[in-house]
A protein has these predicted regions:
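General small-molecule cofactor/ligand-binding pocket signal
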Residues: 82-84
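Non-globular targeting/processing and membrane-anchoring segments
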Residues: 1-44, 49-78, 87, 93-100, ...
Length: 156
């Protein structure tokens, strides 16, 4: 499958990146209520963007996401979609446990199913997204900070 990429705006324009997604029917998620509403009835792909000046791959995934959604629709799978702007994404990053930007999360009923971190080849999206859609929700994980007692070194 080839992607009609077209001309991308300059990566220095985060507002243009957001407009590109909005023009393709992908909702901007600015708070918990919007995030919860997006996937309340089923599956939702949520794109966590970073500032495209810092992470230009944000542009790439913003181009790929509408194509992924179109392919899913052709296969009869309708999935809601939204994006989280960088300032909010940084606050929610620990909650969802991803490390790389941009990240595409699959949520089901607001719970995490899985993630695709960073920009990938098209074949990886084609292979991984159907697997995620057929996967169960992940058990909630709690990250606990680990510290060595005073005066001791950690592992090593």
């Amino acid at each position: 499958m080839t992607l009609p990429l077209g001309a991308s705006p300059t990566p220095h324009d985060a507002a243009a990146l957001h407009q590109r997604l909005l023009a393709r029917g992908i909702a901007r998620l600015d708070d918990e209520a919007q995030l919860a509403a997006l996937g309340a009835g089923g599956d939702a792909l949520v794109l966590f963007l970073e500032d495209p000046v810092r992470v230009p791959e944000s542009w790439d995934v913003a181009v790929v996401l509408p194509e992924v959604l179109a392919g899913l629709a052709r296969a009869g799978r309708v999935v809601a979609a939204g994006f989280v702007p960088p300032e909010l994404g940084r606050r929610w990053q620990a909650r969802f446990g991803f490390r790389l930007w941009p990240t595409l999360l699959l949520l089901r009923g607001g719970a995490l199913v899985g993630a695709i971190e960073g920009m990938r080849d098209w074949a990886e999206y084609e292979a991984q997204i159907p697997v995620l859609l057929d996967s169960p929700v992940q058990e909630r994980r709690v990250a606990l900070p680990v510290a060595a007692p005073a005066g001791e070194r950690g592992c090593g």
